[in-house]
Amino acid sequence: QSISEQIKAFANEQGFSVEIYQSNHEGDIIDLIHKSKDEYDGVIINAGAYTHYSYAIRDAIEAVSDYTPFVEVHMSDIHKREDFRKISVITPVCVKQICGFGKDSYKMGIDLLLKIL
């Protein structure tokens, strides 16, 4: 079972559904973040390498954060990696950062969103 399938199954067990979106295009991610205000109760975001330098994604999250909570997740512990990976420009505009728990980072993000919502 893929990580996406496991996340969907876990969310369904908790009584709600999830949409999973992946893109290598920063503008597409920003468009989805802007849409989240009207379409999603909460968002779990793993911004990959964009985590470390995309002020555009950070600004998009900040613009909708009054309407939609964002939880930042990473499978690896970014704080135990190379120096440039220890920096997250999106953490300040997210409710919380969860990292270092492998695929369980996503489940922990779902649990946190359930508590917030």
Regions from the PLM with identified roles:
Residues F84-K103:
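Short beta-strand elements at the ligand-binding edges of bilobed clamshell
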Residues Q1-N12:
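Short catalytic helix/loop segments, enriched in acidic residues and glycine
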Residues S17-G27:
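Short beta->alpha junction loops
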